[in-house]
UniProtKB/Swiss-Prot annotation:
GO molecular function: ATP binding; phosphoribosylamine-glycine ligase activity; phosphoribosylformylglycinamidine cyclo-ligase activity
Gene symbol of the encoding locus: purM
Pathway: Purine metabolism; IMP biosynthesis via de novo pathway; 5-amino-1-(5-phospho-D-ribosyl)imidazole from N(2)-formyl-N(1)-(5-phospho-D-ribosyl)glycinamide: step 2/2
Similarity field: Belongs to the AIR synthase family.
Keywords: ATP-binding, Cytoplasm, Ligase, Nucleotide-binding, Purine biosynthesis
Official protein name in the record: Phosphoribosylformylglycinamidine cyclo-ligase
Statement: the UniProt record of this protein carries the keyword Cytoplasm: yes
Keyword Signal: no
Length: 346
């Protein structure tokens, strides 16, 4: 037996159970706002229970998981944590809508070296706000305090979402055909992708994040939360014959649009059909980034690209605008030769 007679505790090792309990108490109100009628029980159990909505005849579950990448570093640098949770939810639920999925519930994972209750509460409150916007329930999560794994105030977050879609209504891209119109749904900014390049542009250019651009600081532009499209997109899906939806995330236009196109087709994008939001022009200028690289890294103002019959395009655009979205016809689907690129921007 060791000669040391002092008694060690978990707190001595850097894990504060009391802080974790305080966090749970702080977030209960925010979590309650997200509740759906299908949820069974409250937070704090080992597992969370959720029934399937009764309106679905042949329900198929659709799931997704994601993080917010190095946008988190900007949030840490600027000490602004109340919107990063919205980003986390958006990155998951916007992937579900690609297949027509209605988000049901969301779980989060928050990891840090030393738990700061105020910071964590801000993050979880943002997650709850994102869930409210998406119409899904925040039914559980994990807060991991891991001394020695994270430096200083650093933390990381991950999210997991489950949704449901009617089997007969799954959107899988198989109906996409030459002559289909392409609709763009506007983004709120860079969303949660391309931030390693953004941070490199800031570093190389020596730009000040407090510099103003169109009445807001660069930091505010860059931390603008990712837009959640669920409610407007579900309404569009209910009223129109949607052939495919692409969520423009990491890899930009070149990587994401081909993921929903069948072989032998390509998306022909009219690059003159919209003006990039100012933050993208600023990034391109400050970083001397080539246009091809911009489209391969950022959404350049386009959060979703939707394929549908040409004769429904105008009505779908008007529906989206009525729902508060910025939407426009951005191009069309054409036939593609074997080996030809599936995205062409004119």
């Amino acid at each position: 037996m060791s000669g040391n007679t002092s008694s060690l505790s978990y707190k001595d090792a850097g894990v504060d159970i009391d802080a974790g309990n305080a966090l749970v108490d702080r977030i209960k109100g925010a979590v309650k706002r997200t509740r759906r009628p299908e949820v069974m029980g409250g937070i704090g159990g080992f597992g969370a229970l959720c029934e399937l909505p009764t309106k679905y005849k042949e329900p198929v579950l659709v799931s997704g998981t994601d993080g917010v990448g190095t946008k988190l570093r900007l949030a840490l640098d600027l000490k602004k944590h109340d919107t990063i949770g919205i980003d986390l939810v958006a990155m998951c639920v916007n992937d579900l809508i690609v297949q027509g999925g209605e988000p049901l519930f969301f779980l989060d994972y928050y990891a840090t070296g030393k738990l700061d209750v105020d910071t964590a509460a801000d993050v979880v409150s943002g997650i709850a706000e994102g869930c409210v916007q998406a119409g899904c329930a925040l039914i559980g999560g994990e807060t991991a305090e891991m001394p020695g794994m994270y430096e200083g105030d650093d933390y990381d977050v991950a999210g997991f979402c489950v949704g449901v879609v009617e089997k007969a209504d799954i959107i899988d891209g198989t109906k996409v055909a030459a002559g289909d119109a392409l609709i763009a749904v506007g983004s709120s900014g860079p969303h949660s992708n391309g931030y390693s390049l953004i941070r490199k542009v800031l570093e190389v250019s020596g730009a000040d994040k407090s510099e103003e651009l169109e009445g807001r600081t660069i930091g505010e532009h860059l931390l603008e939360p990712t837009k959640i499209y669920i409610k407007s997109a579900l309404k569009m899906i209910a009223e129109h014959d949607i052939h495919a939806i692409s969520h423009i995330t990491g890899g930009g236009f070149w990587e994401n649009i081909p993921r929903v196109l069948p072989e032998g087709t390509k998306a022909v994008i009219d690059g003159k059909s919209w003006e990039w939001p100012a933050i993208f022009n600023w990034l391109q200028e400050k970083g001397n980034v080539e246009t091809f690289e911009m489209y391969r890294t950022f959404n350049c103002g386009v959060g979703l690209v939707v394929a549908l019959p040409k004769d429904q395009a105008d009505a779908a655009v008007e529906l989206l605008k009525a729902e508060g979205e910025n939407a426009w016809v951005i191009g069309e689907i054409a036939n593609a030769e074997a080996g030809e690129e599936q995205v062409e921007i004119k």
